Design a protein with these regions (language model features):
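Flexible, small-/acidic-enriched active-site or ligand-binding loops
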Residues: 57
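Short amphipathic alpha-helices in soluble, non-transmembrane regions
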Residues: 92-101, 190-197
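A structural signal for small-residue-enriched, beta-sheet-centric alpha/beta enzyme cores
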Residues: 2-39, 62-79, 85-87, 106-203
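Short, conserved "active-site rim" segments that organize catalytic pockets and cofactor/ligand binding
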Residues: 44
Length: 203
């Protein structure tokens, strides 16, 4: 597994109302937690975990062009994620959950970096992204361009899952993939088929 490196974490105990509005933080949630890492997709999953562990919302999450290997500054990495909360304690609890989740996930290296991760019960962030109810299982699938589209077909055929969102390349990081939903076991089967298909590309 290619481990995720947390590059920077900062807190704003009472951010400017104008900044909060532009970032999409709901009114009444002025406390922000900012994080950058070198793996965007793992960070999005970890941000979602925070919404289940603490009274926080993900108000911002964007990947950077070219990916971590082309980062322009030491703390840029591949993604900026921002949590919003009503109190400094809540936003710190949420960020602790993000960092804890990142310690246990990352990209797989099967000749190319890729990710096939089953979220057993999604929080508010991924639920909104996938358009599914909170608590739904999600298969989060990401790989380089040709691998992602080839393997997505295999994942959809391998299990009784629904394609909720397709990320067609080029994305900011030039990868592709998508979010599937179904039962937890179906999502796990889809993840397995996705990884097997990614491996086939180099054969």
């Amino acid at each position: 597994m290619i481990k995720v490196n947390v590059l920077a974490v900062k807190y704003l105990a009472s951010a400017s109302p104008a900044l909060c509005k532009q970032l999409g933080a709901p009114e009444g949630l002025p406390c922000l937690g900012l994080i950058t890492t070198d793996c965007d997709d793992a960070t999005y999953i970890a941000l979602d975990e925070a919404t289940k562990a603490a009274e926080v919302q993900v108000c911002y999450g964007r990947s950077f062009y070219g990916g971590a290997s082309n980062a322009s500054t030491p703390y840029a990495g591949e993604v900026l994620g921002i949590l919003a909360a009503a109190t400094p304690g809540a936003v710190r609890s949420g960020m602790d959950a993000v960092i804890s989740a990142l310690e246990h996930m990352g990209f797989e290296d099967v000749g190319v970096p890729c990710m096939a991760y089953t979220v057993s019960s999604c929080g508010s962030f991924l639920a909104a992204e996938a358009g599914v109810p909170m608590g739904s299982p999600i298969a989060y699938l990401i790989a380089p361009p040709i691998e992602s589209m080839y393997a997505m077909d295999a994942a959809l055929k391998a299990a009784d899952v629904k394609l909720c969102k397709l990320y067609t390349p080029p994305t900011e990081t030039n990868f592709g993939g998508g979010l599937l939903t179904g039962t937890q076991s179906a999502c796990q089967a889809a993840c397995g088929a996705f990884m097997d298909a990614v491996r086939e590309i180099k054969e």
